[in-house]
Structure formats: C-alpha cells, structure tokens
Swiss-Prot record:
Name of the gene encoding the protein in the UniProt record: ZHD8
GO molecular function: DNA binding; protein homodimerization activity; transcription cis-regulatory region binding; zinc ion binding
Top-level division of the source organism's lineage: Eukaryota
Name of the protein described by the UniProt record: Zinc-finger homeodomain protein 8
Keyword Phosphoprotein belongs to the record: yes
Length: 271
C-alpha cells in the first residue's frame, strides 16, 4: 500500500509540473556582431527608435489631366478624415479635397531627420585604410616618425595647369628658333669672284658645264647650292648694275651681240 501511495504522489507531482514544461521559451535574438581588424565590435544604434515626422502640404493632383490641361483643387494642406487609420491605406484620404495623401506634397521635418541619423564610428576593416584623425587637443603633437612617413601635399589643379601651359609655351617659342634659316656669310673676295663668274655666264647656272661650276665653287670655298641661291638673289641687282655700266646693254642678254662661252677647260672667252 505504501508503494502505491508513493507512486500516486509522484504521478500527481509530474502532472502539476507539466504546464511549466510546456510553457513556450522565448529566445532573445542575438545582437549583430561585426569583426573589424580582429576585434569584435557591437553596433550601438543610438537613435534607431526615433520615427521620422513628415507633414503633407498642398495637393498636387491634376484634375485636368484627362483633357491635357493642368488644374489643381487649391487644397493647401492634408486634413485626415474621421475614419483615418494608419494601417488601412484606403482611409488615407483628405477631409478637405477627398484626394489620397500621396497626392499631397510630402515635407520632412529637419529636426526629426537629424534625430534618426545614427552616429558613425570609424572602424577600418583592413590595415590599408588611413587611421582616424587625431583629437583636436592632440592635433599639434607630432611624433618623430611623422617627417619620414608623411607624404608631400597634393598639387592643386591650378598649379598643374600653369605648369603645363608654361611648358607648352616654352616649346612653342623654341620651334621658331629651330626653324630659323641659316644665313651664310661671304667674304669680300668670295663676293667679287661670284659676281665676276655670274657676269660671265649671264647670271644663269650653265647645266652643260657642271664640272666647271663645281671647280669654281671648290676654288672659292663655297658650296654649289649656296652659290646657286646667291646668284638667284643677286640676279636683278647684278643685271641692272651691268646694264648701267654698259649703257643699257646686258652682257649675255638679248640686247648684246656678244655671248659668253664657258669652255670645258675652265677658261672664259667672249665672241
């Protein structure tokens, strides 16, 4: 009898504890954890519970859109209807104009916007990012390694443009100097010899006696191309001077009966 009574007592105790075991257990959600550079950091949402406050101003619904026009009803501010319910979108109508709240211009409250902005903490996730700036009271203190590790300040774009424009201008000024034509200077002896030879050949370069011309240029020390240019530049002045000296007759010209002959042996004679 004692055994049966004890068993009955144990069963009754289990029946009384059964509701406690079947009670649902609430599991608290874990807070988000982020790892930054090997350190565990908890996100602190400072003002996450703040709700943005917005007001709805004038109605912008175009009542003449069907006919291609533009007409407003003149409602200046959204007025909630008596059956307003934030959970029922159909009840969000204006009591003044009867339009839905979405047709009214939404205007955020600046004070509420500043309240819901969370504070941002500088937490570099790798070692390649720059460290945060020092506090204001430590800004003037510098370590001995700052001079070695500090990089030079960046060059502004205005200085770069000035440098490029200056370099471009220098290149432009140097180009005319490189293209300047070289002017050959002749001695008085060379001028007299070239003038005398040009008078004999009629101020024209003889193509048949090219050997004689080359020999003459070698004797006076002047290149053939240079002598040809000199003859071309002084042709007019040389012929006019010879015409004045001969009384209007040009040696080797059309009005002269004498013709200068340049033989192949280098001697000159007139016939």
């Amino acid at each position: 009898m004692d055994v049966i009574a004890t068993t009955t007592t144990i069963v009754s105790d289990l029946d009384s504890r059964q509701p406690e075991i079947e009670a649902p257990i609430r599991i608290q959600p874990a807070k988000p954890i982020s790892f930054s550079n090997g350190k565990r950091c908890h996100h602190h949402h400072l003002a996450s519970e703040a709700v943005a406050v917005a007001t709805y101003k004038e109605c912008l619904k175009n009542h003449a859109a069907g006919i291609g026009g533009h007409a407003l009803d003149g409602c200046g501010e959204f007025m909630p209807s008596p059956s307003f319910n934030s959970n029922d979108p159909a009840s969000l109508t204006c009591a003044a104009c009867g339009c839905h709240r979405n047709f009214h211009r939404r205007e955020e409250d600046p004070s509420s916007l500043s309240a819901i902005v969370p504070a941002i903490e500088f937490r570099p996730h790798n070692r390649h990012q720059l460290p945060p700036p020092p506090p204001p009271h430590l800004a003037g203190i510098r370590s001995p390694d700052d001079d070695d590790s500090a990089s030079p300040p960046p060059i502004s774009s205005s200085y770069m443009l000035l440098a490029l424009s200056g370099g471009r201008g220098g290149a432009n000024t140097a180009v005319p100097m490189s293209r300047k034509r070289f002017r050959t200077k002749f001695s008085q002896y060379q001028k007299e010899k070239m003038f005398e030879f040009s008078e004999r050949v009629g101020w024209r370069m003889p193509k048949a006696d090219d050997v004689v011309v080359k020999e003459f240029c070698r004797e006076i020390g002047v290149d053939k191309s240079v002598f040809k240019v000199w003859m071309h530049n002084n042709k007019i002045s040389g012929r006019s001077g010879a015409r004045r000296a001969n009384g209007g007759v040009v040696v080797g010209g059309v009005g002269d009966s004498r013709q200068s002959v340049v033989p192949t042996n280098g001697s000159f004679s007139s016939t």
